[in-house]
């Protein structure tokens, strides 16, 4: 069993963390890229089989996405399960979690993972039935974060949120109609931030299981932000409060 990843950052990140997962790598024939050459040398030093391929082959393997001239066939990584969450929480005095409810675009999932990694989030939680898959597109956008931030898929998000509350984790949800803003919130301790789908927001049951609702103040004419942008804003306000 194998999966495909593509893009310089995604391949580089996996090489640094788990070189044993590589099976073979395809490089665009004739491409001379100063960012690509050191990566090729590093792959070769690990004994990874590298093959030259034309653009049509790479485009087909990546479903027409921007692959930057490199695609790798790799062994699947660790799949975190719902029952891994208590152990992950126990590793930290102040767990910092991100919950994504209804983020179904892999580009947005990848961007949220990238922001989560940069902010020091310990795990990202998504529902099994309303979430994008962690596919090659999401991994490329994540720029390596998909290999460092545990992504946990849960069967029942509301039940998981209740479990988090039993672990004394404060759950902060984002909603446009919240009565106070992100900058009036208190997020210094054990917490989980909940982000809903762009436009739709959180589902009703998810909203009802939040301990606090906050909004991002908007000064312009647009009514909402892309979920990955909003996630970055909220995460780094939490980081500011936690440091």
Swiss-Prot record:
- An MF annotation (GO) of this entry: rRNA (guanosine-2'-O-)-methyltransferase activity
UniProt keywords, alphabetically: Cytoplasm, Methyltransferase, rRNA processing, S-adenosyl-L-methionine, Transferase
Enzyme Commission number(s) of this protein: 2.1.1.185
Q: Which SUPFAM superfamilies does its entry note?
A: alpha/beta knot, L30e-like
Q: Which residues bind S-adenosyl-L-methionine?
A: 196, 216, 225
Instruction: Please tell me one Gene Ontology term that the record gives under cellular component.
Output: cytosol
Q: Where in the cell is it found?
A: Cytoplasm
Q: Report the protein's function.
A: Specifically methylates the ribose of guanosine 2251 in 23S rRNA.
The protein in question is named 23S rRNA (guanosine-2'-O-)-methyltransferase RlmB
């Amino acid at each position: 069993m194998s999966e495909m990843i593509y893009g310089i950052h995604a391949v580089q990140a996996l090489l640094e963390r788990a070189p044993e997962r590589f099976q073979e790598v395809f490089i665009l024939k004739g491409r001379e890229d100063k960012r690509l050459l050191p990566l090729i040398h590093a792959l070769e030093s690990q004994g990874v089989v590298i093959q030259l391929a034309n653009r049509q082959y790479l485009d087909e393997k990546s479903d027409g996405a921007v692959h930057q001239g490199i695609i790798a066939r790799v062994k699947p990584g660790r799949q975190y399960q719902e029952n891994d969450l208590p152990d992950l929480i126990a590793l930290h005095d102040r767990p910092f979690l991100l919950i994504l409810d209804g983020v179904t675009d892999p580009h947005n999932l990848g961007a949220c993972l990238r922001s989560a990694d940069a902010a020091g989030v310990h795990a990202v939680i998504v529902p099994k039935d309303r979430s994008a898959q962690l596919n090659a597109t999401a991994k490329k956008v994540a720029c390596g974060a998909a290999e460092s931030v545990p992504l946990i898929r849960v069967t029942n998000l509301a039940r998981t949120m209740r479990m988090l509350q039993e672990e004394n984790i404060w759950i902060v949800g984002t909603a446009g109609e919240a009565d106070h803003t992100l900058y009036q919130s208190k997020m210094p301790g054990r917490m989980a931030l909940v982000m809903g789908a762009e436009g739709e927001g959180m589902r009703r049951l998810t909203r009802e299981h939040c301990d606090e609702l906050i909004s991002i103040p908007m000064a312009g004419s647009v009514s909402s932000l892309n979920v990955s942008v909003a996630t970055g804003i909220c995460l780094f306000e939490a980081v500011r409060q936690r440091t």
